[in-house]
């Protein structure tokens, strides 16, 4: 997930998931009528689409857009086959949502910036606030950075399903 996110950032020259989606030819739709849906990714007949709740704020919009872009980059074949919808429908424990969250963390949160804030003594809440992000996304990023060789203390396990718990 890290390499795919870094390649996209380099190719598109931005960490902005909506600009990247546009560069990749992914159509983004907004709907203000979604009650419990934050976002969704679909791929039908070579048409890649992201559907976003139009009421998302400045923290949630980039996060959900990056998460759905993660599904495009990591799970397009599953989305094409329709199996991704079954995973969501039956709330099966699977790795697709966590992988999309990890991708979003790599896309939105720069390793060196996170590392510098942690070295300055910022806690997870302060890092999330400083980077205009969500605490769980920062926790996922810290875990992934440890796997990349950074030596960071992750105080608690992130809730990989945190996007599902948000209500607009």
Q: What is each stretch, according to the model?
A:
Residues 1-168:
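Active-site hotspot residues in diverse enzymes, especially metal/ion-binding acidic/histidine motifs
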